[in-house]
């Protein structure tokens, strides 16, 4: 399971020109589900996302996690993160989970997140437009 996290000043996701999820300061989490992923991996990734220290403390050092900084999560499904780009000029998605598994784990991830922090989401498998102001920029690839 892959989480590409971006520290943002704000982020929103739209479907058919309608905003379906929006946060102010926090983390945009692009979530990719791979074959073999399960709820245990989702739990580990969520704990990493919630505890990853990417927000500045009083001394300007990245020492606070999203909860300590008072931020939120915007979780967006992103199957292209599971792409194999090693060969050729076209990505292969053979490592990606089936749509049913990916949706189940995406739903599980954001539901568990919502129990711990203010969480907004995109819409699984929809054609989405994601807008954000990356703060830093600060972007990390987390994989479990």
UniProtKB/Swiss-Prot annotation:
Keyword Repeat listed: no
Any Gene Ontology biological process: D-amino acid catabolic process
A GO CC annotation given for this chain: cytoplasm
InterPro entries per record: Daa-tRNA_deacyls_DTD (IPR003732), DTD-like_sf (IPR023509)
Catalysed transformations (reactions): glycyl-tRNA(Ala) + H2O = tRNA(Ala) + glycine + H(+); a D-aminoacyl-tRNA + H2O = a tRNA + a D-alpha-amino acid + H(+)
Molecular function terms, GO-annotated: D-tyrosyl-tRNA(Tyr) deacylase activity; Gly-tRNA(Ala) deacylase activity; Ser(Gly)-tRNA(Ala) hydrolase activity; tRNA binding
Predominant cellular place of this UniProt entry's protein: cytoplasm
Enzyme's top EC category: hydrolase
Keyword tags: Cytoplasm, Hydrolase, RNA-binding, tRNA-binding
Location of the protein in the cell: Cytoplasm
Subunit structure: Homodimer.
Family, per entry: Belongs to the DTD family.
Function: An aminoacyl-tRNA editing enzyme that deacylates mischarged D-aminoacyl-tRNAs. Also deacylates mischarged glycyl-tRNA(Ala), protecting cells against glycine mischarging by AlaRS. Acts via tRNA-based rather than protein-based catalysis; rejects L-amino acids rather than detecting D-amino acids in the active site. By recycling D-aminoacyl-tRNA to D-amino acids and free tRNA molecules, this enzyme counteracts the toxicity associated with the formation of D-aminoacyl-tRNA entities in vivo and helps enforce protein L-homochirality.
Domain notes: A Gly-cisPro motif from one monomer fits into the active site of the other monomer to allow specific chiral rejection of L-amino acids.
PANTHER family membership: D-AMINOACYL-TRNA DEACYLASE 1, D-TYROSYL-TRNA TYR DEACYLASE
Protein name per UniProt: D-aminoacyl-tRNA deacylase
Native organism: Glaesserella parasuis serovar 5 (strain SH0165) (Haemophilus parasuis)
Source species taxonomy: Bacteria, Pseudomonadati, Pseudomonadota, Gammaproteobacteria, Pasteurellales
Gene transcribed to yield this protein: dtd
């Amino acid at each position: 399971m892959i989480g590409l996290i971006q520290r943002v000043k704000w982020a929103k996701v739209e479907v058919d020109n309608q905003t379906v999820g929006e946060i102010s300061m926090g983390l945009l989490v692009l979530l990719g589900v791979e074959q073999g992923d399960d709820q245990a991996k989702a739990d580990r990734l969520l704990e990493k996302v919630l505890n990853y220290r990417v927000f500045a403390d009083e001394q300007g050092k990245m020492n606070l996690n999203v909860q300590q900084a008072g931020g939120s999560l915007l979780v967006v499904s992103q199957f292209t993160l599971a792409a194999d780009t090693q060969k050729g000029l076209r990505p292969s998605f053979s490592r990606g989970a089936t749509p049913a598994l990916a949706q189940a784990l995406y739903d599980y991830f954001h539901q568990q997140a919502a129990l711990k922090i203010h969480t907004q989401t995109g819409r699984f498998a929809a054609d989405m437009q994601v807008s954000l102001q990356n703060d830093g920029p600060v972007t990390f690839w987390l994989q479990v």
